[in-house]
Amino acid sequence: MLKSAIVSIVRASTRFAAFTVLIGVFLAVAAGFYTYQHFGINTDINHLISSDLDWRKRDIAFEKAFDQERLILAVVEAPTPEFANAAAAKLTAELSKNNINFDSVKRLGGGPFFDRSGLLFLPKDEVAKATGQFQQAVPLIEIMAGDPSIRGLTAALETGLVGLKRGELTLDATAKPFNTVAATVEDVLGKQQAFFSWRGLVNPEPLTDGDKRAFIEVKPILDFKALEPGKAATDAIRQAAVDLKIEQDFGARVRLTGPVPIANEEFATVKDGAVVNGIGTVVVVLLILWMALHSSKIIFAVAANLVIGLSITTAVGLMLVDSLNLLSIAFAVLFVGLGVDFGIQFSVRYRSERHKTGDLEKALVQAAEYSAVPLSLAAMSTTAGFLSFLPTSYKGISELGEIAGAGMAIAFFTSITVLPALLKLLNPAGEKEPLGYAFLAPVDHFLEKHRIAIIVGTIGVALAGLPLLYFMHFDFNPINLRSPKVESIATFLDLRKDPNTGANAVNVMAPNEQAAREIEAKLAKLPQVSRTISLDTFVPPDQPEKLKLIQAGAKVLEPALNPEQIDPPPSDQDNIASLKSSAEALRRAAGEATGPGADASRRLATALTKLAGADQAMREKAQDVFVRPLLLDFELLRNMLKAQPVTLDNLPADIVSSWKTKDGQIRVEVLPSGDPNDNDTLRKFAAAVLQAEPLATGGPVSILKSGDTIVASFIQAGLWALLSISILLWITLRRISDVALTLVPLLVAGAVTLEICVLIDLPLNFANIVALPLLLGVGVAFKIYYVTAWRSGRTNLLQSALTRAIFFSALTTATAFGSLWLSSHPGTASMGKLLALSLLTTLGAVLLFQPALMGKPRHIDESGDTDL
């Protein structure tokens, strides 16, 4: 019944060939127009998991409550903390004026509130120490505030040397500051880009990268009609940084990360090189088709059939899922790789029949008769393999399976309608030579003669490698699927190195402030937790004592910071004289002494002497290098001395909105201890937090849950694929033994594929795990072709035209998968790599293992025709 139906379809298609082709072209054009109107890609990796899962619902609720998805984090990095803060303040002010691209712009951990209240967040003893240092520095601050120039700086230096004479400090204690100043002067003299931080000078610990960063949180207005909805916003930020001369004035750079830039660059990474790879793939596929078919007319027919099918599949896919995702977009490559298989199988069968009969229409009908069962069974099995993803919670692959499954049905239908019609219209020349591979006769005989040894050896190798699967691991971190070369990911990876940035934070929602405090207290006791943060964190403890210390310091320091008058700017000659005077004072201080302090004094004296002997422009540059950050620090110091009590009631609204929802829920942020870049550390951290607070969400918790979901989906899809394909095979073949002959080589290929993955250190991940259930659908097609030929009594299968069709079909599929391997996107590339590997093992199983496993047919075809 199936055979007669397909033969009837082929007869009708060739009888009305022009009409059939016209309908196919019309549908392809209409589908292309629909695709043009509705094409879209959702690049958000979070949407690859079903939103119906409990943990995903919590993630989504949290993201909506705090608008986390629509976020750009601008990271301002400068050579000094002063310039990082100044550049961020300038950029924040500029972006706040833009109501076209941004809904809101705010500083994180900076701005007026933190400038004024910064001292309150220090421990009480550190506040006392800082205010004490302020009072000791009054004479120096008074000089520099009243004369912010080279003259004032050198005067402050000489005042400090007086303290050295009095024994208030040792010469060696000056080694660090003197060397730091000397190095900066040397950079100026060497015409290098020079920067100086007064904060770094007085800080006992070296400045970290985190000290020299400032953050701006931007909520952009997204254009969802564009393929990159946030591109206008990110472009506006970058242009603002250029217009403000952030790099020239502050030596700063602005990098963007967060969901919006990551999504933008994710799409850019996917399309990067896609055109070149696509063209290369087409060229190679055409070359393979030529080697398989040796006829430009047949190649044109197969290629045209493929284009028509792909156009229709794309439109149908968009109808099914609205927009493609980063995994489902691979359907096009899968369609080319697998859809062309049907075309090659039918065309090679047609060529074989044309060689025997010489009549075009008769050859097409006979090709349909011979191909009907294996081709339709292969199409159904491949479709079943793809559709096995539908019941899973891994939405990204579920949608890929849905589209690719529809694509296989479309490819099969066009291969028995449009392709025969095209061949009828094009009327390729007859075949003069048989299509089999007679040179493979020795291999056929070897497989037959050593059948038992090959079966035992192959299964033995597969079984011996099973212990390797213990070392197979799943890389559950989706960040590893993204290119570390793009700015947004490179920035995120840099931030992740700093445990204080919260890049690996987990969040817990508390119903109220008291519950938040209880959750904080419980989680803070976990060894896997380094610290917790909530709204209460922004209300410093011990404020009365700290405010008294600050007020006492302000009484002494404010007059020095705000002199009644500022000295007129010095002349260049004044600066030269002051430099020489300070150099001489440094040499006197060093005297004949040895040690780091004396060496540093002489080094600084030499640098100041050289600066005095340089041109005026060099001295003006040096003055700018030291004075600009000094004035910024003085302004910050003035603000810090104005600290006022901080309560939950007077916290800035932008801080409150980041930690408290409108209905009163409080966010508790939990940061991990240990190496934040270690997957095992993050897994233990997430597990510990979940055990204490099962409703925790975000960060490593979401990553851990995603990994569990995907592994479960893979197992579920694999079982569904195996079950559905087995049922299809049994319905068609009606023999359990024949079903086993089809599936055993497939399972062996699957086991060997995983074993090789361990040996070449190719872990499974969110993207490439798709290859394994697909292996069932793809690989079973080749097995079906051999089993159906074997059941019909054919022998010497390697010498047949069937092997030619399978070999070149596999080559085209490998080429399509190889194009994925060459992708700039790490996730897509890993998927292509594993697909290509699985195809290689599958081809080896079908060409070498399966003939030995099948042995001689039950009923041998005595015709002796190997050109099948």
Curated annotation (Swiss-Prot):
The chain crosses the membrane at residues 16-36, 273-293, 298-318, 326-346, 370-390, 403-423, 452-472, 710-730, 740-760, 762-782, 805-825, 834-854. Keywords: Cell inner membrane, Cell membrane, Lipid transport, Membrane, Transmembrane, Transmembrane helix, Transport. InterPro entries: Hopanoid_biosynth_HpnN, MMPL_dom, Mycobact_MmpL, SSD. Residues 299-425 form the SSD domain. It comes from the Bacteria. GO terms for cellular component: cell outer membrane; plasma membrane. It is a multi-pass membrane protein. Disruption phenotype: Deletion mutant no longer contains any hopanoids in the outer membrane, and contains elevated concentrations of hopanoids in the cytoplasmic and inner cytoplasmic membrane fractions. Total hopanoid abundance is unchanged. Deletion mutant grows like the wild-type strain and forms single cells when grown at 30 degrees Celsius, but grows slower and shows a filamentation phenotype at 38 degrees Celsius, suggesting that cell division is affected. One of its GO terms (biological process) is lipid transport. Pfam families: MMPL. Belongs to the resistance-nodulation-cell division (RND) (TC 2.A.6) family. MmpL subfamily. Essential for hopanoid transport from the cytoplasmic to the outer membrane. Required for the C(35) hopanoid, bacteriohopanetetrol, to remain localized to the mother cell type. NCBIfam families: HpnN (TIGR03480). This is Hopanoid transporter HpnN. The gene is hpnN.
